[in-house]
Amino acid sequence: MISSKPSKQRKLVYNLPNHLRYKLLTARLSEDLEKQYGIKRISIRKGDSVKLMRGSQVGYEGKVVEVDRKRGRVAIEGLTKKKADGTPVYVWVHASKVIITKLDTGDKERMDAIERKRKMREEYFSKKSPKEVS
């Protein structure tokens, strides 16, 4: 039996192994990408272009420079702040606070995964009746 206690759910996330943390690093696709690829969300990768949807920098667009699986956050090109000594450091943003505006399509395996997800989604919605979908 799986617990529904919030404290145990948080503990599960905190103690999750690194090779499973990529599942927490998913973000929605923009509307035009959603129509183009037929999926709603995908894991964020270095090289994707994203747009901030929450926080003080809302609307900022840039390329993902680094992904920190342990903290579940991404660094975006150009989104920096200065330390006390003047050196710039990245502002780390939680993956759920961004929308992917352009995918890095250089990896064939990723494109195969997108195609797999699209087919599964189409299959799922084709089985449901029109009344259940809406």
UniProtKB/Swiss-Prot annotation:
Identify the species of origin. Sulfolobus acidocaldarius (strain ATCC 33909 / DSM 639 / JCM 8929 / NBRC 15157 / NCIMB 11770)
HAMAP family documented for this protein: Ribosomal_uL24_A (MF_01326_A)
Physiological role: One of two assembly initiator proteins, it binds directly to the 5'-end of the 23S rRNA, where it nucleates assembly of the 50S subunit. Located at the polypeptide exit tunnel on the outside of the subunit.
Recorded GO MF terms: rRNA binding; structural constituent of ribosome
Query: Taxonomic classification, please?
Result: Archaea, Thermoproteota, Thermoprotei, Sulfolobales, Sulfolobaceae
Q: What is this protein called?
A: Large ribosomal subunit protein uL24
Q: What keywords appear on the UniProt entry?
A: Ribonucleoprotein, Ribosomal protein, RNA-binding, rRNA-binding
SMART domains this protein is in?
A: KOW (SM00739)
What's a single GO BP term from this record?
translation
